[in-house]
Regions:
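Short, functional N-terminal and low-complexity linear motifs
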Residues: 9-11, 29-31, 52-56
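Short proline/glycine- and basic residue-enriched helix-capping loop/turn segments at helix->loop/beta transitions
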Residues: 33-37
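Enrichment for repetitive, rod-forming helical segments
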Residues: 22-24, 31, 59-62, 87-88
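Enriched for short, Lys/Arg-rich terminal
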Residues: 2-5, 64-98
Length: 98
């Protein structure tokens, strides 16, 4: 499998920036691993179909594989307990703005 590059949404970049330095380092390391093996994350279903989730400690990295551009789109990062609800809310707000 070819190597991928990462691309971050503004929301994901902002959330990573606000994390504790140790957690931020672990998230960045996990993303580097995903660039080599992007299928390591779990496929999401229903309204989140097309996205994948990767667990690192108590956090989730939500991303999309873009094979055409050899890119991983990092969509969202957050604590496991509410990451999917927050992501659904964000996606719904984006659809309403369109």
């Amino acid at each position: 499998m070819k190597g991928y590059r990462s691309r971050y949404t503004l929301e994901a970049a902002d959330r990573i920036r606000k994390l504790h330095p140790q957690v931020k380092q672990e998230i960045r390391q996990a993303i580097k691993e995903l660039l080599v093996s992007p299928l390591n994350g779990h496929s999401l279903q229903f309204e989140l179909a097309g996205l994948r989730s990767y667990r690192i400690r108590t956090y989730r990295i939500i991303y999309r594989i873009n094979d055409d551009e050899s890119c991983l789109d990092i969509v969202f990062v957050g604590p496991r307990r509410n990451v999917y609800e927050e992501l659904r809310t964000l996606l719904l707000a984006q659809r309403e703005d369109s």
